[in-house]
Amino acid sequence: MLHQLSLTFGSRDLLDKIVKQNSDRRFVLLAATGGAKDLQLLDISGQESIFTSHLDYQVKIEHGQPDWQGFFSFNYFDLNAESAKVFEGEVNKIAANPLPDGMTTMLVLSKLKNSSEYILLTIWDSSDAFMIWRRSNKFAPFTKYATSLNNFHAATYQLAPPKKQPEHDQA
């Protein structure tokens, strides 16, 4: 089981450099969906963070076996202590059941330096499977947290495509 996950954002060159300089770690490079150029690098080695972003999270709940492939949904919440207990209880109930069709992993993360900041990270076979779940009553337990009061925001990612190699002119 993964106990810690760290993440950072940056340009392709910067993130590739981090990966190259830390070959002893396991990373996942993600690209934002919808045509955005945003890149995110996950350190899934479980080791202390090497990033300066301070986006370091404790894995509170893990359901499924992450293979770190597919479609990634990040839902961010800032919860007070009481809401956090209720949220974790509801997620534990959900985690006691089989994952929804197409979901391979559900992770609940809380920030190491500010435990009121949560991420619900779900990994899917496809964006279609995610959208079906998102519109179903199985997502209902999360809708009450998906408000501006909880500083809610969401982002979706997929594995970043391999870096294009420069084409060499053939003379």
Where are these regions (language model features)?
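Short S/T/G/P-rich N-terminal loop/turn motif that feeds into the first structured element of a domain
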Residues: M1-G102, L107-S115, A129-R135, F152-A171
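Mixed-charge, glycine-accented linear interaction segment located at domain edges/termini
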Residues: K138-S148
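Cys/His-rich zinc-coordinating modules
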Residues: L120
